[in-house]
């Protein structure tokens, strides 16, 4: 019997609160690059372990540090003067029953592949230096297969949190960044780089969006063209947001620009990321497991990217909580808003947490008796199927930032 608790949440629903703040750091932000590299290295190791040994061995690659380079962007195309330095750290199994695996090679290759796929104007070979300092350990397959068919044991006493549904402001912030960094948008407007941050502020029924968007200098001939692209970004974000909300909208783009000065200062880059010129990055310093930073909502400070997907509850429970919450809202009539909290106890099976709690705000006309059993059922089913979280992570089907 799992310890599942369902209780009413005595709180003003998010859409009725007077002030709401939401942030998303796009995939080209240095903190998000660190998250993306960490997770891609973990996923590459998982698949290498499965191919070689038939099981995922212990590892954590959630310590990626980006030290910014130096660049000289200019209209028409500038240059990277000093490369971006990327340090991969953490720990991983490099030898199993006397058989070695190329851990460093796999990690560096995964990091570079991630950069090529996601920061498309970055010359990975000449503009980055990737160094691997992941600690090496050894493993025993007998220990791994001894637990086959049983839930892994929690690596820590930790908790995960999630919520659903997204508010209008949360949807707008998430979808605006996704739009600007979509392949279709990049093909149409190649000057728009990947380093995009969207900050949303809702004051009652007025939503203000502030977008920071790195432009790629080689695709921008002069200040006039730069301003044209800024207007495109503004108009496209406004159009997207208007399809989500009927609230009043205002969109600002690159508000630090100084276009009227004798020597204009604008946000142009050589590569599309500010990591090229002074902005460092670290894992876990940006988006939470659901892709947003939401001070109005419950959040965990745990970084999810790069942690092992087998028994690291700081990763698994945060992702599981969000899956649970979304499922509850979508499948159970009468649930207006739900917060999920799951607490582990070190050394105990991860499918039997110390506590799994759902805090629920109901739609008008419903009682807790109407939904408690159904909510418990959804949570119990997800805990029973917790290996599916691991499977989705290994296949790259779950967002971790």
Curated annotation (Swiss-Prot):
Keywords: ATP-binding, Magnesium, Nucleotide-binding, One-carbon metabolism, Transferase
Signal peptide: none
Pathway(s) this gene product operates in, as recorded in its UniProt entry: Amino-acid biosynthesis; S-adenosyl-L-methionine biosynthesis; S-adenosyl-L-methionine from L-methionine: step 1/1
Reactions the enzyme catalyzes: L-methionine + ATP + H2O = S-adenosyl-L-methionine + phosphate + diphosphate
Residues bound to ATP: 135-140
EC number: 2.5.1.6
Name by which UniProt lists this protein: S-adenosylmethionine synthase
């Amino acid at each position: 019997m799992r310890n599942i608790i369902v209780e009413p949440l005595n709180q003003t629903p998010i859409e009725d609160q007077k002030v709401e703040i939401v942030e998303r750091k796009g995939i080209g932000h240095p903190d998000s690059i660190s998250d993306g590299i960490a997770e891609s290295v973990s996923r590459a190791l998982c698949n290498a372990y499965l191919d070689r040994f038939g099981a995922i061995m212990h590892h954590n690659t959630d310590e990626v540090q980006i030290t910014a380079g130096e660049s000289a962007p200019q209209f028409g195309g500038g240059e990277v003067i000093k490369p971006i330095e990327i340090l991969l750290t953490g720990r991983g199994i490099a030898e199993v029953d006397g058989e070695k695996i190329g851990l460093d090679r796999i990690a560096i290759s995964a990091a570079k592949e991630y950069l090529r796929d996601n920061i498309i104007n970055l010359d990975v070979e000449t503009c980055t230096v990737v160094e691997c300092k992941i600690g090496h350990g050894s493993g025993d397959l007998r220990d791994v297969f001894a637990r086959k068919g049983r839930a892994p044991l929690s690596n820590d006493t930790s908790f995960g949190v999630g919520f659903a549904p997204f508010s209008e402001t949360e949807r707008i912030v998430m979808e605006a960044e996704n739009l600007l960094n979509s392949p279709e948008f990049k093909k149409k407007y190649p000057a728009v780089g990947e380093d995009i941050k969207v900050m949303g502020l809702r004051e009652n029924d007025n939503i203000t969006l502030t977008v920071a968007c790195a432009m790629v200098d080689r695709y921008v001939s002069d200040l006039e063209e730069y301003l044209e692209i800024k207007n495109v970004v503004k108009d496209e974000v406004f159009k997207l947001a208007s399809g989500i909300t009927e609230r009043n909208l205002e969109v600002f783009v690159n508000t630090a620009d100084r276009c009227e000065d004798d020597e204009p200062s604008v946000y142009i880059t050589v590569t599309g990321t500010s990591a090229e010129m002074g902005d460092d990055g670290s894992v876990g310093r940006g988006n939470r497991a659901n892709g947003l930073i939401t001070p109005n909502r419950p959040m965990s400070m745990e970084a999810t990217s790069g942690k092992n997907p087998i028994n690291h509850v700081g990763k698994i429970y945060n992702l599981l909580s969000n899956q649970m919450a979304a499922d509850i809202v979508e499948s159970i009539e009468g649930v207006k808003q739900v917060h999920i909290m799951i607490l582990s106890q070190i050394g105990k099976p991860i499918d039997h947490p110390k506590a799994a709690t759902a805090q629920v705000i109901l739609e008008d006309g419903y009682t807790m008796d109407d939904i408690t059993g159904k909510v418990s059922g959804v949570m119990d089913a997800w805990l029973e199927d917790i290996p599916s979280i691991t499977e989705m992570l290994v296949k790259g089907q779950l967002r971790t930032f």
